[in-house]
Amino acid sequence: MKWVTFLLLLFISGSAFSRGVFRREAHKSEIAHRFKDLGEQHFKGLVLIAFSQYLQKCPYEEHIKLVQEVTDFAKTCVADENAENCDKSIHTLFGDKLCAIPKLRDNYGELADCCAKQEPERNECFLQHKDDNPNLPPFQRPEAEAMCTSFQENPTSFLGHYLHEVARRHPYFYAPELLYYAEKYNEVLTQCCTESDKAACLTPKLDAVKEKALVAAVRQRMKCSSMQRFGERAFKAWAVARMSQRFPNAEFAEITKLATDVTKINKECCHGDLLECADDRAELAKYMCENQATISSKLQACCDKPVLQKSQCLAEIEHDNIPADLPSIAADFVEDKEVCKNYAEAKDVFLGTFLYEYSRRHPDYSVSLLLRLAKKYEATLEKCCAEGDPPACYGTVLAEFQPLVEEPKNLVKTNCELYEKLGEYGFQNAVLVRYTQKAPQVSTPTLVEAARNLGRVGTKCCTLPEAQRLPCVEDYLSAILNRLCVLHEKTPVSEKVTKCCSGSLVERRPCFSALTVDETYVPKEFKAETFTFHSDICTLPDKEKQIKKQTALAELVKHKPKATEDQLKTVMGDFAQFVDKCCKAADKDNCFATEGPNLVARSKEALA
């Protein structure tokens, strides 16, 4: 991915961090330094998240003991930085704690082999054993009264359990952001637990926090995947495009500085350096608030908030207004006769400036699209600057962008129209059929999860103003497809999925969109037990009922990959009527037992 090399020269000139944010040499004890910077509450929360993300099976009580031991040790080092072991790196201290856990091999198998390694290999080994799909039961929210009682009796323990349960299910969750969501959780409970109808107050508010947190989890996993697979340069390119969209009035040097710092912070969190990551994120927020004049006119409201809220607010900040007097981008990058000379003399800066200039003019594009355009521009210059008449060759490059722009625009239009016609559940089913046909080898639970998440794009994005739809849709789809890739990589079963997941991150969504029905797939045999249901479905929450039905739908498609829309509609309609009828019957069990085989026979016949 040489097209992201533009940042090389700019790294040398440094950033806010190189001017003194990170001065490790000034601190004899890294852990004392982080404890003093973060404060005890945030320090303990981050240590709990770190242990929960590494050792995902350990109960809360065991992790809390480790957290207290690390906190007590940090306090010792704050009092005397020369005390024994205070000069050790945080990775060494944490790794030693993990490796001292009794029965580590019994509970975690090969992870125990990491303990034979030295740092930094030991930490790398721990990271490789993080499980994106741990075998943990779905998190069940307690009843409102019980939740409030537990919260009011011991708020610290209650919120600690929240951090533990989320972190161990999402081992790459952005740690300082998870602290923010715990803070929001605390606010909701503090407000609602004094209400007469606690459930009515809690449910919608906690649902909203949960939805935002789940989206944050998949977005951060994509960032870590990008870092792991393609390195820091690819991530920095993403950051330059995103920052240029948000802060179009900032100079290129400022944008590059911010992008470099954001990359460093994300690398730390993805690498398990949660204390450093959170500390540096707070420093970046401080820098941005001290330099509002050169960044954006929209920052002030964020800068008045406490540290966690400030950083989160800055991360979600609305785009600043685009300068009114921006010249045509063609002037410097197409019409200038010195384009090839400028490109050859400083490719890094020239391509970086192009990405910056194009991105600041297009807040209505997704970051993935902007990076595809930058890639196209570089490929054009590489080709044309080697020819006899370069200006004639690259003169049409901006027009050649049009097909790349139209493809995601058409995707948004088609899918939003389908969503408006079918609603969220119907749209999820359409996506499920589409992806089961593309990759029928993928496990049904994974397909159902992916389709349900992909299907939510309509609710999230299709109601937004036109200018916000494309970036919302494509950036959200990219994050969800990354989750599919992460799960598939663990147990690869589809060559098509492997191909899309192995290529460039910015080409991944178009790759999946272009997949067609897998002609090599041998249909599954029709098994009656797959479509046999019992009365327990009647008492399931609506979400669980939907998942049961969608599981059956995916299995139908695997049995008949080329089934028509009408065939599937007939079978699923028949199934819905069957469930509705038997759930209303006086003798539900008898109804399911007698009507079930008839349903199976009709379904088999309809799909013949």
Swiss-Prot record:
Q: Which residues bind Cu cation?
A: 27
Q: Which residues, if any, are the signal sequence?
A: 1-18
**Family from the record:** Belongs to the ALB/AFP/VDB family.
**Which residues are noted in the entry as Ca(2+) 1-binding?**
30, 268, 273, 276
Q: Which UniProt keywords apply?
A: Calcium, Cleavage on pair of basic residues, Copper, Disulfide bond, Lipid-binding, Metal-binding, Methylation, Phosphoprotein, Repeat, Secreted, Signal, Zinc
CDD domains registered for this protein in UniProt: ALBUMIN (cd00015)
Q: Please state the protein's primary subcellular location.
A: secreted
Q: Give the molecular function GO annotations.
A: DNA binding; enterobactin binding; enzyme binding; exogenous protein binding; fatty acid binding; identical protein binding; modified amino acid binding; protein-folding chaperone binding
Q: Which residues form the propeptide?
A: 19-24
Indicate where the modification Phosphothreonine is found in the sequence: 444, 446, 570
Listed GO biological process terms:
cellular response to calcium ion starvation; cellular response to starvation; negative regulation of mitochondrial depolarization; positive regulation of circadian sleep/wake cycle, non-REM sleep; response to biphenyl; response to mercury ion; response to nutrient; response to platinum ion
Q: Which GO terms describe its cellular component?
A: basement membrane; cytoplasm; extracellular exosome; extracellular region; extracellular space; protein-containing complex
Protein's name in the database: Albumin
Q: Where are the transmembrane segments?
A: none
Please give the organism.
Rattus norvegicus (Rat)
Q: In which tissues is it expressed?
A: Plasma.
Keyword Disulfide bond in the entry? The reply is yes
Question: Which PROSITE patterns does the entry link to?
Answer: ALBUMIN_1, ALBUMIN_2
Q: Assembly state and interactors?
A: Interacts with FCGRT; this interaction regulates ALB homeostasis. Interacts with TASOR. In plasma, occurs in a covalently-linked complex with chromophore-bound alpha-1-microglobulin; this interaction does not prevent fatty acid binding to ALB.
Disulfide bonds listed in the record: 77-86, 99-115, 114-125, 148-193, 192-201, 224-270, 269-277, 289-303, 302-313, 340-385, 384-393, 416-462, 461-472, 485-501, 500-511, 538-583, 582-591
One Pfam family linked to the record: Serum_albumin
Q: Where in the cell is it found?
A: Secreted
Annotated Ca(2+) 2 binding lies at: 37, 279
Question: Does Zinc count among this protein's keywords?
Answer: yes
- As recorded in Swiss-Prot or TrEMBL, the protein's gene is named Alb
Albumin domain: which residues? Answer: 19-211, 212-403, 404-601
